[in-house]
């Protein structure tokens, strides 16, 4: 399960806006993850690598979606909404 997180980081760092969204969505669907707490932490720890120039905004996005993660029914929808905002911010 850790592999999918590293792939997400690689996608954020290297792919364009359209491909990033499509590939992250597919990756999360394929990995069948239901708990994204480790992903939130990894994204925070590595924000300097993938969010250069937008670090403060990315941290605020992570915080907002981590908070809502605790109360939403479908966590995959919540995490993809987060990636829509992140990708829109950094690409």
Regions from the language model: what does each represent?
Residues 1-91:
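AAA+ P-loop NTPase domains with strong preference for DNA replication initiators
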């Amino acid at each position: 399960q850790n592999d999918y997180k590293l792939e997400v980081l690689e996608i954020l760092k290297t792919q364009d806006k359209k491909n990033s969204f499509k590939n992250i969505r597919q990756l999360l669907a394929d990995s069948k993850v239901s708990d994204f707490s480790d992903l939130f932490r990894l994204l925070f720890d590595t924000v300097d690598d993938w969010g250069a120039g937008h670090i403060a905004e990315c941290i605020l996005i992570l915080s907002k979606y981590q908070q809502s993660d605790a109360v939403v029914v479908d966590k995959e929808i919540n995490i993809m909404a987060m990636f829509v905002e992140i990708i829109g911010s950094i690409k």
